[in-house]
Each structure stands twice: as structure tokens, then as C-alpha cells.
């Protein structure tokens, strides 16, 4: 069944979100050229720099996908990119933007995974949080716009108290520090910033029912406005614990009232999967699921 991206009940609120996103500007924004902070990590023949390195193109074809990574790792801060996703029939493809500690079995990881679709269906973004090697915390949201028509900003804000995933400055997920409930929280290992474009038609679209259509290849995704603000590791030893870092300020301890309303709107109208409510996987909800925002 084709799902409409918009419904009459959502139009007014969608316009309100657009106004909020236009008025809000990230603190100390510093968009950079690709080579300032990143390197090609996988298949350099499939990544092309555009506009003097201010934007890049990722390509997926039957021979290979591709990926890039930050030159440094970071412990706390905010990372963001503007991404224009694959248009049309993108079923079976995954465009990922994530942070990863690169520590194998005890890895920490914060994921945005954009799951390709058949033409006319909404794009789904899956988020996941790995802490001390434990993941299985998937949530899925249908985006309320067509992310292939223009660039949209995707950001991860990470401090000692919480992790927030943003789409155009609208929070779509909050993961709190619940170590008091014996829930692991990523606060010891620095993480690099990564992005990949790859084929995953065994699970990405409708659980693997929709397969990739290679006759439409190559598939392209575009990136620009790369922004990393955080404590580099190696770097000043006192940086990660410095409470004066802007991302540790009181404004970033909890969502603002406007953000909280936007977050609830996303969950009510656009969330299509939440591990917290999946009783087949978790008959007893994990303890972090009752933490609220």
C-alpha cells in the first residue's frame, strides 16, 4: 500500500516545524570542506568531490558501494551533515550516517540509517544506539517530506546526560543516560564519524521483501555542510570533562518546550517501529524505555 507523506491533519504542524527549523540555528556552526575533517574509507572511485570539496557525491552500483570517515575521533559534542538521498526507486539501498568507536565487541555506535523505498512510499530512517557492545535499540520514523528532492540536515547531539537525533533541528529520538538503572551509556570511548552507501536488500525495505532494482543503478546520494564540534581524541585531556563546553550547557540537558512538542508529534504521527513496544522481542520493556524525555 502506498503511504502518503502528508495528511490534512499534519499540514499545519509540518509548516510549524519548517518555521521552527528556519528560525533555529545551531550554536557555533562551522560547515567545512570534505577534506578538512574527512577521508575516503572505502572505494575512492565511487566518491566524487563537488564544488571544490564543499559537497560530495556517493555512488552505489553492482560493483561496489562506498564510504567515508572522519580523520579524528571525538568524545561528546555535535555532528551534522546535510544529505540529499537517492530519488525514485531506491529499494534495497541503505544510506548511513553514524558515529562508531571502532572497538569491535565493546563498540559504541549512534546510527542514522536511511532505508530505500519503492517510488511513492515514504523514506524511513532507522536510528539505533549501541553502548558497551549492546545494541538492538532500533526505532523507525517515516520522514514527513521527500528527502531526495533537496538537502536536509541530520544531526547527533551527544553529552554526558543524553543523546538526541535531529532531522532539520526536529528531535526524532532521545536516549538518556540511565546508568543509575544499570543501562549502559556511551561516555568512555571516543567515536569517529562515518557515512556509507551500500546494498542491503536482504532487510532494508519491508524486511527484505522489496529487492534492489539494479537496472536503475547507479544510485547517488549527496552530502554538504559537514560540521563537527566536539572534543577530539587525541586532544586536550580535560576537554571531555569540561562542563563549560557549550553542548554540556543547561540548554542541552533536556528538550525545550518547542522541541518536546515536535518530538511528541513525530512519535505520534510518523514513528512506525519502536523496540520499546515490540513485545515479541522484549516481553518486558528494557529499563531505558520508561525514562521519558
Curated annotation (Swiss-Prot):
Subcellular localization: Secreted, Cell wall; Secreted, Extracellular space, Apoplast
Post-translational events: Contains at least one intrachain disulfide bond essential for its enzymatic activity.
Keywords from the named record: Apoplast, Cell wall, Cell wall biogenesis/degradation, Disulfide bond, Glycoprotein, Glycosidase, Hydrolase, Secreted, Signal, Transferase
Disulfide bonding pattern of the chain: 231-239, 276-289
Residues that carry a glycan: 117, 213
InterPro entries hit by this protein: Beta-glucanase/XTH, ConA-like_dom_sf, GH16, GH16_AS, XET_C, XTH
Site (described: Important for catalytic activity): 111
A Pfam match: XET_C
Active site, renumbered: 109 (nucleophile), 113 (proton donor)
Single GO term (MF): xyloglucan:xyloglucosyl transferase activity
Binding site for xyloglucan: 113, 126-128, 136-138, 202-203, 207, 281
Similarity comment: Belongs to the glycosyl hydrolase 16 family. XTH group 1 subfamily.
Function: Catalyzes xyloglucan endohydrolysis (XEH) and/or endotransglycosylation (XET). Cleaves and religates xyloglucan polymers, an essential constituent of the primary cell wall, and thereby participates in cell wall construction of growing tissues.
Protein name: Probable xyloglucan endotransglucosylase/hydrolase protein 7
Amino acid at each position: 500500500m502506498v503511504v502518503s507523506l502528508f495528511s490534512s491533519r499534519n499540514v499545519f504542524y509540518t509548516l510549524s516545524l519548517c518555521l521552527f527549523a528556519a528560525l533555529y540555528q545551531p550554536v557555533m556552526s562551522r560547515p567545512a570542506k570534505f577534506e578538512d575533517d574527512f577521508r575516503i574509507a572505502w572505494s575512492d572511485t565511487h566518491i566524487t568531490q563537488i564544488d571544490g570539496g564543499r559537497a560530495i557525491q556517493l555512488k552505489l552500483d553492482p560493483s561496489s558501494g562506498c564510504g567515508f570517515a572522519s580523520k579524528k575521533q571525538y568524545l561528546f559534542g555535535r555532528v551534522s551533515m546535510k544529505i540529499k538521498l537517492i530519488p525514485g526507486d531506491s529499494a534495497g539501498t541503505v544510506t548511513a550516517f553514524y558515529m562508531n568507536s571502532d572497538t569491535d565487541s565493546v563498540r559504541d555506535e549512534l546510527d542514522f540509517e536511511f532505508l530505500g523505498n519503492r517510488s511513492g512510499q515514504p523514506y524511513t530512517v532507522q536510528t539505533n544506539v549501541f553502548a558497551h557492545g549492546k545494541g538492538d535499540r532500533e526505532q523507525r520514523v517515516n520522514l514527513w517530506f521527500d528527502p531526495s528532492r533537496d538537502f536536509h540536515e541530520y544531526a547527533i547531539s551527544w553529552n554526558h546526560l543524553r543523546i538526541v537525533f535531529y532531522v532539520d533541528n526536529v528531535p526524532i529520538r532521545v536516549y538518556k543516560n540511565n546508568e543509575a538503572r544499570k543501562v549502559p551509556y556511551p561516555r568512555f570511548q571516543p567515536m569517529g564519524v562515518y557515512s556509507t552507501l551500500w546494498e542491503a536488500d536482504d532487510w532494508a525495505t519491508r524486511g527484505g521483501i522489496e529487492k534492489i532494482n539494479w537496472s536503475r543503478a547507479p544510485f547517488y546520494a549527496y552530502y554538504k555542510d559537514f560540521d563537527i564540534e566536539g572534543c577530539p581524541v587525541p586532544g586536550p585531556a580535560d576537554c571531555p570533562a569540561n562542563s563549560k563546553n557549550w553542548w554540556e550547557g543547561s540548554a542541552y540537558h533536556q528538550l525545550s518546550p518547542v522541541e518536546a512538542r515536535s518530538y511528541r508529534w513525530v512519535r505520534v504521527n510518523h514513528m512506525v517501529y519502536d523496540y520499546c513496544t515490540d513485545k515479541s522481542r522484549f516481553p518486558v520493556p528494557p529499563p531505558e524505555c520508561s525514562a521519558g524525555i
